[in-house]
């Protein structure tokens, strides 16, 4: 060997994460990461890599009046612990407006070729429950429609810019208000 050892992978402790979540995150993100307030995201069942990315972004570069002050005091280990905890929690199902969800499903699965909107399923999986953990693309199924709508509007207006290579900003810039509402409802109704 050349005398260099590979760094051990950093792993979170779900039990420590639960204690931290119950003390700091519970008020907004709800029991087990299932927010009861539709403008705050559900964290239950989310990829740990995505949660780590978001918390580190809040600590380092993503200004948000609610989350930045909450994330700043977290140690790197606490971030890993929270991510490990939330990843193991079951998410509560959502219900969708059937008419909007039907329109949203088409957009999610196939995009809108006329306006250049790519299919959401290409990155977030065929049913919104997979995402791609290594790429840090989130799971979207059962997420609150209000939160998803707000997030897409923030990407569209470049109020949120922590997406790799501007991928979400580029896709959201082509979405109409009606398309945002429809895909948000569709995702809220997915149970995977």
UniProtKB/Swiss-Prot annotation:
Binding site for heme c 1: 25, 28-29
InterPro entries, alphabetized: Cyt_c-like_dom (IPR009056), Cyt_c-like_dom_sf (IPR036909), Cyt_C_IC (IPR008168), Cytochrome_c4-like (IPR024167), Cytochrome_c_Oxidase_Subunit (IPR050597)
Post-translational modification: Binds 2 heme c groups covalently per subunit.
Annotated GO CC locations: periplasmic space
Name of this protein: Cytochrome c4
Chief location of this protein within or outside the cell: periplasm
GO molecular function: electron transfer activity; heme binding; iron ion binding
Record-listed heme c 2 binding positions: 120, 123-124
Gene Ontology terms: biological process: electron transport chain; heme transport
Keywords associated with the record: Electron transport, Heme, Iron, Metal-binding, Periplasm, Repeat, Transport
The Cytochrome c domain, residue ranges: 12-90, 99-191
Organism: Thiocapsa roseopersicina
PROSITE patterns cross-referenced by the UniProt entry: CYTC
Keyword Aminoacyl-tRNA synthetase among record annotations: no
Superkingdom assignment: Bacteria
Protein localization: Periplasm
Any matching Pfam family: Cytochrom_C
